């Protein structure tokens, strides 16, 4: 009982992680590593579309074919659809089960391999699945308790991250709207011309050349750039005689300009 309590506390301590610490390519790798260590298993966290948010391989079970899925950070659609139909934890699925995470070509190598899938919920919504597996050791009741707690903890973190992302999107959109509202017609025209000059989200431009091309003064372009930069939409740096280096850091400006085209 003491061991179970200790492991439970280690899992719930994951909630103390800030959302900022999850802003990475595989934001849940650290969490998956902890779960794999605590429960003694391999662990994989996927979202509702099968995107791999994080995984930990304590034991090697993948073939080269399956390893490609993990490297691509996306599980096969058929498998994801089947996993999404699980509404309660399915424990100790054998290698013969369609939902086994073990590669079909390695069934003879890991005949006793077991997979457990726990749905991840947050705010009443299905957010993904927690998949854990072992080569030969059955997940007992204590393990299943830890798995249920783990899926709840991950669900809370996923929901927190979604909320954070939504707030960031709203903040960026508000900044764009406020900046657009301060632009005159000529400045709006200048912004559209400037962004068309960029190679993707960044590039070098010469204000005087753009001004002559669209029939406005150079000062209009300078004012427009200053307003966008103060709103946190772009970053600029003078290159002297070579012009100005510009980088868009709030990409929503591209979509916003389409509304005015």
UniProtKB/Swiss-Prot annotation:
Signal peptide: none
Record localization: Cytoplasm
Top-level taxon of the source organism: Bacteria
InterPro entries (alphabetical): ArsR-like_HTH (IPR011991), CodY (IPR014154), GAF-like_dom_sf (IPR029016), GTP_trans_reg_CodY_C (IPR013198), Transc_reg_CodY_N (IPR010312), WH-like_DNA-bd_sf (IPR036388), WH_DNA-bd_sf (IPR036390)
Annotated GO MF terms: DNA binding; DNA-binding transcription factor activity; GTP binding
Record bears the keyword Transcription: yes
GO biological process, one term: negative regulation of DNA-templated transcription
DNA-binding region: 207-226
Start and end residues of each stretch annotated as GAF domain: 1-159
Keywords: Cytoplasm, DNA-binding, Repressor, Transcription, Transcription regulation
UniProt xrefs under NCBIfam families: codY_Gpos, PRK04158.1
HAMAP family associated with the record: HTH_type_CodY
Family under the similarity heading: Belongs to the CodY family.
Record's function text: DNA-binding global transcriptional regulator which is involved in the adaptive response to starvation and acts by directly or indirectly controlling the expression of numerous genes in response to nutrient availability. During rapid exponential growth, CodY is highly active and represses genes whose products allow adaptation to nutrient depletion.
Alphabetical list of PANTHER family matching this protein: GLOBAL TRANSCRIPTIONAL REGULATOR CODY, GTP-SENSING TRANSCRIPTIONAL PLEIOTROPIC REPRESSOR CODY
Protein name stated in the entry: Global transcriptional regulator CodY
């Amino acid at each position: 009982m003491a061991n179970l309590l200790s492991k439970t506390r280690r899992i719930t301590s994951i909630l103390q992680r800030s959302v900022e610490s999850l802003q990475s390519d595989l934001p849940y790798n650290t969490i998956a590593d902890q779960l794999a260590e605590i429960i003694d298993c391999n662990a994989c966290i996927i979202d509702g579309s099968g995107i791999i948010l994080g995984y930990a391989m304590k034991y090697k079970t993948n073939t080269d074919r399956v390893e490609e899925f993990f490297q691509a950070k996306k599980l096969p659609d058929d498998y994801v659809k089947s996993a999404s139909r699980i509404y309660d934890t399915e424990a100790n699925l054998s290698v013969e089960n369609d939902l086994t995470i073990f590669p079909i070509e390695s069934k003879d190598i890991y005949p006793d391999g077991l997979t457990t899938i726990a749905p991840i919920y947050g705010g009443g919504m299905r957010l993904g699945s927690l998949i854990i597996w072992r080569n030969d050791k059955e997940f007992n009741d204590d393990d299943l308790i830890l798995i249920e707690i783990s899926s709840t903890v991950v669900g809370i973190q996923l929901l927190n991250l979604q909320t954070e992302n939504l707030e960031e999107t709203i903040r960026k959109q508000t900044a764009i709207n406020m900046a657009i509202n301060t632009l005159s017609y000529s400045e709006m025209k200048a912004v559209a011309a400037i962004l068309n000059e960029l190679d993707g989200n960044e590039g070098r431009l010469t204000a005087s050349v753009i001004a002559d091309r669209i029939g406005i003064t150079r000062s209009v372009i300078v004012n427009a750039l200053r307003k966008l930069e103060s709103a946190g939409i772009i970053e600029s740096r003078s290159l002297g005689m070579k012009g100005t280096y510009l980088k868009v850091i709030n990409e929503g400006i591209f979509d916003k300009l389409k509304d005015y085209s």
